[in-house]
């Protein structure tokens, strides 16, 4: 069933009419200053001139389209159910008709086939969760089953732990599955509240922690220096390729969905922080603005998971046990939606503070400044690189000039300066400390110290090493584990294709398309609005190329298979940048 088309389209027409009449409000990134002034060709920089709004017609609505229903599976002998599903062919966009939320169907059935789903348990079978635990864990005061059945009908409780101990910081988040296609944490897949009777204390900062059974190590890091790495980018294209895309990209796995090495955990592009970052920085695409990116990483702990005999969370355990043995994408897709695509095997916990100074090239040249001067002075203001005086001398800039640069940065919201924007991104710590840093002109030692103290007790997961979720399906817990594992791997391949934003139609003005469920949205750069980012004051904006979706893999030939994609979603025009990355991939087979 499709819903809400008339409402969406009426809203689209009213928004377009409102834009035509000039009643839309575009909030600027600087206090009170609109960010949608026309781009004049004065060395390519953004120069404020009399605005003329573009009223380009919004693209036609695109209706959501689902595939036809698959055939019903055979009746599953253990679940006594059969299944069918549909999948997304085309997402809705630009106020097109939405798809019915139901993309699978299940119905009861009868079969004479025997069910052999039980794994033999030599210990105690938990009443509700079905977990198998050692009998020595009964009546020990811990909820080893996850349903308290191991503590029921006890004449006496023999506690292993005689005193209360704390949970490791962020331990529940580390036990969650993670969707690496969207950089989001999902439901719990591991039980980090299970201790197998272990009660060895682990002291960190005078706090006594209890180590979960699944955890191999949780090592505190004692280095507490706030060192900044400052990097200069002479163009937006370099900044986008080396900074933005690394933060917001969707992982593109080629084979096996393995993650090689420890990697930075990016941000969710449709989150508030992701939208703010993309909107404000993309505003300066195809200008001659210069970028100074500063980054400080504070590590507070390193985490490592055991490599075998893991205790799964009972919710995940039951969901996997309820999967049909005959492959049905709809059921396996729901598991991936609810529990993610991967689980974390190693992690770095801590905080990241970073800011980006966006500088007007013409104003810098008029003031006889270089980006190196700004880098030295911004770093010197925080004491980076030793004595501030030595920093000034080393780069050949006077203390007065550095003072003027800092004044330009601090007064950018009050008057026109060579600083076009200061974009801050903070991860880790409490909301109060994050807010204080995010709205400060530049970080002070006092603010950084307060934030660092908060990060110790509220760390974010900033780097991870991960394995595909199907690696948790082992013969220890599941009958027919090899069949379920292969089904889950196949579903992961289909899921990657179905959730990719390459399915979305191009947004105008270099907007970023985001696929949310079965609907695409455009995240617009500053200076653009509308459902497709079609409303703007700017003219003749170069359009950067974006990739289409990958083709299916070819048949295996000569020990190799290939797939291809095209730079046509959209193709670059008006001097826009070409797509980065390969147009084809080849794998051994």
From Swiss-Prot:
Specify the propeptide location in this chain.
32-53
Instruction: Print the keywords alphabetically.
Output: Calcium, Complement alternate pathway, Complement pathway, Cytolysis, Disulfide bond, EGF-like domain, Glycoprotein, Immunity, Innate immunity, Membrane, Membrane attack complex, Metal-binding, Phosphoprotein, Repeat, Secreted, Signal, Target cell membrane, Target membrane, Transmembrane, Transmembrane beta strand
Cite the GO molecular-function annotations of the record. protein-containing complex binding
Residue ranges of every copy of the LDL-receptor class A domain listed in the record: 120-155
What does UniProt list under activity regulation? Membrane attack complex (MAC) assembly is inhibited by CD59, thereby protecting self-cells from damage during complement activation. CD59 acts by binding to the beta-haipins of C8 (C8A and C8B), forming an intermolecular beta-sheet that prevents incorporation of the multiple copies of C9 required for complete formation of the osmolytic pore. MAC assembly is also inhibited by clusterin (CLU) chaperones that inhibit polymerization of C9.
- Residues binding Ca(2+) are 137, 140, 142, 144, 150-151
Q: Provide the EGF-like domain boundaries.
A: 404-534
Provide the GO biological process annotations.
Answer: complement activation, alternative pathway; complement activation, classical pathway; killing of cells of another organism; positive regulation of immune response
- Signal sequence region: 1-31
Report the outcome of residue 497 to R. In strain: Mae/Stm and MSM/Ms
Pfam families for the chain: EGF_C8A_B_C6 (PF21195), Ldl_recept_a (PF00057), MACPF (PF01823), TSP_1 (PF00090)
Residue positions of the PTM Phosphothreonine? 417
One GO cellular component from the entry? extracellular space
Q: Which residues form the MACPF domain?
A: 157-503
Q: What disulfide bonds does the UniProt entry report for this chain?
A: 64-99, 75-109, 78-115, 121-132, 126-145, 139-154, 161-199, 377-402, 502-549, 504-520, 507-522, 524-533, 556-589
Q: Report whether Repeat shows up as a keyword of the record.
A: yes
Subunit structure, interactors included: Heterotrimer of 3 chains: alpha (C8A), beta (C8B) and gamma (C8G); the alpha and gamma chains are disulfide bonded. Component of the membrane attack complex (MAC), composed of complement C5b, C6, C7, C8A, C8B, C8G and multiple copies of the pore-forming subunit C9.
Family to which the UniProt record says this protein belongs = Belongs to the complement C6/C7/C8/C9 family.
Name this protein carries in UniProt: Complement component C8 beta chain
Q: Which gene encodes it?
A: C8b
């Amino acid at each position: 069933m499709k819903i809400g088309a008339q409402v969406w389209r009426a809203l689209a027409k009213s928004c377009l009419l409102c834009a035509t009449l000039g009643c839309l409000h575009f909030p600027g990134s600087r206090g009170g200053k609109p960010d949608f002034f026309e781009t004049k060709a004065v060395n390519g920089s953004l120069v404020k001139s009399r605005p003329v709004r573009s009223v380009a017609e919004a693209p036609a609505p695109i209706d959501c389209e689902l595939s036809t229903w698959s055939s019903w599976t055979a009746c599953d002998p253990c679940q006594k159910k059969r299944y069918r599903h549909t999948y997304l062919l085309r997402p809705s966009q630009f106020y097109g008709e939405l798809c019915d939320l139901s993309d699978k169907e299940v119905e009861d059935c009868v079969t004479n086939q025997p069910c052999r789903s039980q794994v033999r348990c030599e210990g105690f079978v938990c009443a509700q969760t079905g977990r198998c635990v050692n009998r020595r864990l009964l009546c020990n005061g811990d909820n080893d089953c996850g349903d308290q059945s191991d503590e029921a009908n006890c004449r006496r409780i023999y506690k292993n732990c005689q005193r209360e101990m704390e949970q490791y910081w962020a331990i529940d988040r580390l036990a969650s599955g993670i969707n690496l296609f969207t950089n989001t944490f999902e439901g719990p897949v591991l039980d980090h509240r299970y201790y197998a009777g272990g009660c060895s204390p682990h002291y960190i900062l005078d706090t006594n922690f209890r180590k979960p059974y699944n955890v191999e190590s949780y090592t505190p890091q004692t280095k507490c220096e706030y060192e900044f790495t400052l990097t200069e980018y002479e163009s937006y294209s370099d900044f986008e390729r080396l900074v933005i895309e690394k933060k917001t990209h969707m992982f593109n796995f080629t084979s096996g969905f393995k993650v090689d090495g420890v990697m930075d955990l990016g941000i969710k592009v449709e989150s508030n922080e992701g939208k703010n970052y993309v909107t404000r920085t993309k505003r300066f695409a195809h200008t001659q603005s210069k970028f100074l990116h500063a980054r400080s990483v504070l590590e507070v702990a390193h985490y490592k998971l055991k490599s075998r005999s893991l205790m799964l969370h009972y919710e995940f355990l039951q969901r996997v046990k309820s999967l049909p043995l005959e492959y049905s994408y709809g059921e396996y897709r729901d598991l991936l939606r609810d529990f993610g695509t991967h689980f974390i095997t190693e992690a770095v916990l801590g905080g990241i503070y970073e800011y980006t100074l966006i500088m007007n090239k013409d104003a810098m040249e008029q003031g006889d400044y270089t980006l190196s001067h700004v880098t030295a002075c911004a770093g010197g203001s925080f004491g980076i690189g030793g004595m501030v005086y030595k920093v000034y001398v080393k780069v050949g800039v006077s203390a007065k000039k550095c003072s003027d640069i800092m004044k330009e940065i601090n007064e950018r919201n009050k008057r026109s300066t060579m600083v076009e924007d200061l974009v801050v991104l903070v991860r880790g710590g409490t909301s109060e400390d994050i807010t204080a840093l995010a709205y400060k002109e530049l970080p002070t030692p006092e603010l950084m110290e307060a934030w660092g103290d908060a990060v110790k007790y509220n760390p974010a997961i900033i780097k991870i090493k991960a394995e595909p979720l199907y690696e948790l399906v082992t013969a220890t817990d599941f009958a027919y584990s090899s069949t379920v594992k292969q089904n889950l791997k196949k579903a992961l391949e289909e899921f990657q294709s179905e959730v990719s934003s390459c399915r979305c139609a191009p947004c105008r003005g270099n907007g970023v398309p985001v696929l949310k469920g079965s609907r695409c949205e455009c995240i617009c750069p500053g200076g653009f609005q509308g459902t497709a980012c079609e409303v703007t004051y700017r003219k003749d904006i170069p359009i950067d190329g974006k990739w289409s979706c990958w083709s299916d893999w070819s048949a295996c030939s000569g020990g190799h298979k290939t797939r291809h994609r095209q730079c046509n979603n959209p193709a670059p025009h008006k001097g826009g940048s070409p797509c980065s990355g390969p147009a084809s991939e080849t794998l051994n087979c």
